Amino acid sequence: MKVEEILEKALELVIPDEEEVRKGREAEEELRRRLDELGVEYVFVGSYARNTWLKGSLEIDVFLLFPEEFSKEELRERGLEIGKAVLDSYEIRYAEHPYVHGVVKGVEVDVVPCYKLKEPKNIKSAVDRTPFHHKWLEGRIKGKENEVRLLKGFLKANGIYGAEYKVRGFSGYLCELLIVFYGSFLETVKNARRWTRRTVIDVAKGEVRKGEEFFVVDPVDEKRNVAANLSLDNLARFVHLCREFMEAPSLGFFKPKHPLEIEPERLRKIVEERGTAVFAVKFRKPDIVDDNLYPQLERASRKIFEFLERENFMPLRSAFKASEEFCYLLFECQIKEISRVFRRMGPQFEDERNVKKFLSRNRAFRPFIENGRWWAFEMRKFTTPEEGVRSYASTHWHTLGKNVGESIREYFEIISGEKLFKEPVTAELCEMMGVKD
């Protein structure tokens, strides 16, 4: 099948059907009516306003525009008051400042307060940029809406769509800028094959250059990197996917990949064959939003991984997972058990003062000289990675992220073997260990 034929079929997966479009229009009309009754100044922004939303992902974003003279407290209070008044049902959510998420005629809606500014350089918070983003894109994206949908669908099917910390992928705004810059999905994919970690894409100037990091210049604020939340690994995944797609295009690139789930018995055999120590730190999930939770999980995972390296347990990889009730930090180590004794390096024999200090310590075994340097046998506090992590998490919980650390301090357990394989982490374990279908 030719690329063009594949993309035609892919469009069926990403373009909303007539019913979804009708539902959106009805909700928009009702929302406009309610806002107009309140005499509020507002603007519809985002993928719905620009007709670039993905099939099945209908959500309306409306920004309330307040005068610059309003204090942040006035903006917050008035924004919440209006949001509550115009939605059928609602909940308060938090970004840089609170906003209202809810439903109008069965469609999800975000009502976000911001300042009405003349210039983007005068922004007081990140959301103040959004109306400028919409204004810049509105005319330029016309006629390319489905190209945006193809790119979003391609990214979503491969797990790298969304700038939130849980994903650290491509934002919707970034997708639209790439389509404006390259002109189509296919041209974006062709060119992305040559991206590097130092590629700079300046959309407003229409140029690609080399810089210090992967940087997509915001046409509204040239100092801002639209790709700042995109992780290096997800950039690499996208480049690889683009190369694969151009070598052997197929509709499969637009179909969601289901996480590999295998039976505990098969997982047990895989771990046995690998001869490694596989275990998890399990603790209660802190009651915080994902964008605060996931950076802390990443930090905790990294800190424990570094500890395992220092203690010579030779960790291979780590992963983490948050379920409804619990969080899991997953690790695989090459060393299942290490000797109790190890050798500690001391000073060279010429260093009299430090030699004296080194030899004065009370040890179970005699120190010795090797290649002109003093060495000593010392005893480890723990001989398995599980013992080590139990000790480290108990004493260093305060280094593992504010909320995650507190949760670990209150309760945690180290689980492995059959108990671990019965927890809802099999997909993450398979990914961590590179298990094939």
Curated annotation (Swiss-Prot):
Coiled coil: none annotated. ATP binds at residues 47, 50, 133, 152, 161. GO terms for molecular function: ATP binding; CCA tRNA nucleotidyltransferase activity; CCACCA tRNA nucleotidyltransferase activity; magnesium ion binding; tRNA binding. CTP binds at residues 47, 50, 133, 152, 161. The keyword Nucleotidyltransferase applies. Changing residue 133 to A: No decrease in both AMP and CMP incorporation. Catalyzes the addition and repair of the essential 3'-terminal CCA sequence in tRNAs without using a nucleic acid template. Adds these three nucleotides in the order of C, C, and A to the tRNA nucleotide-73, using CTP and ATP as substrates and producing inorganic pyrophosphate. tRNA 3'-terminal CCA addition is required both for tRNA processing and repair. Also involved in tRNA surveillance by mediating tandem CCA addition to generate a CCACCA at the 3' terminus of unstable tRNAs. While stable tRNAs receive only 3'-terminal CCA, unstable tRNAs are marked with CCACCA and rapidly degraded. Belongs to the tRNA nucleotidyltransferase/poly(A) polymerase family. Archaeal CCA-adding enzyme subfamily. This is CCA-adding enzyme. It comes from Archaeoglobus fulgidus (strain ATCC 49558 / DSM 4304 / JCM 9628 / NBRC 100126 / VC-16). The gene is cca.
